[in-house]
């Protein structure tokens, strides 16, 4: 039986502080939060058969949620009065109209807003932001993972720098090979799990570096 519902980072917070909590931003992606009003949605809880008592307490990302438990402090060798926050603001994307791009396995683009909005095409997702406002998020499923796939699975190398050395400044924007980075389907803006990747513009004289450049630019653009 389910005792409590929490996200992975919330479990770490719980082990540190003993507090069952999450932040509004992460809760926005659980499909159980009324993002506009920043509270758990009774409608969604009823649909999913989830009791609100099993859900974590909600905090703004910057708010302290507690201090270390005696056990955690002893294990980590830290003072017990160390303050633990729900999350952190590290990219400076606070206040309306700020943009942040985060690239990892997938790639996300965040645009902050002072007001709540819903994209009727469902290409962007609305989340609560750390400053009490909101942000719209677009996500591509394959970002830096495309470079990893190309280098390691196709070229059989982990020397990324060597592969990118031939891509000099004069070649940027001048490549005639294009790469569609849909290796795992796509979310924003297509929401199409059947989307597939492709190289376009290949010729007999297409050099290896042009393909590497196409992979990088395909993700970037």
Language-model features, listed with the residues they occupy:
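Active-site core segments that coordinate phosphate-bearing ligands/cofactors
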Residues: 1-22, 31-42, 46-49, 64-221
């Amino acid at each position: 039986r389910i005792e409590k519902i929490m996200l992975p980072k919330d479990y770490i917070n719980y082990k540190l502080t003993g507090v069952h909590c999450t932040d509004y931003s992460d809760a926005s992606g659980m499909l159980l939060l009324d993002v506009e009003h920043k509270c758990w949605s009774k409608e969604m809880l009823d649909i999913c058969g989830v009791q609100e008592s099993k859900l974590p307490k909600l905090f703004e990302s910057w708010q302290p949620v507690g201090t270390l438990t005696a056990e955690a402090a002893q294990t980590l060798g830290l003072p017990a009065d160390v303050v633990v926050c729900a999350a952190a603001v590290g990219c400076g994307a606070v206040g309306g109209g700020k943009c942040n791009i985060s690239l990892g396995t997938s790639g996300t683009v965040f645009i902050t807003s002072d007001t709540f909005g819903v994209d009727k095409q469902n290409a962007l997702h609305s989340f609560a932001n750390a400053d009490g406002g909101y942000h719209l998020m677009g996500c591509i499923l394959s970002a830096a993972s495309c470079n990893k796939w190309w280098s390691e699975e196709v070229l059989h190398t982990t020397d990324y720098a060597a592969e990118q050395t031939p891509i000099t400044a004069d070649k940027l924007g001048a490549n005639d090979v294009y790469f569609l980075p849909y290796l795992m389907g796509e979310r924003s803006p297509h929401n199409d799990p059947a989307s597939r990747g492709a190289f376009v513009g290949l010729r007999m004289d297409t050099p290896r570096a042009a393909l590497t450049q196409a992979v990088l630019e395909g993700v970037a653009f």
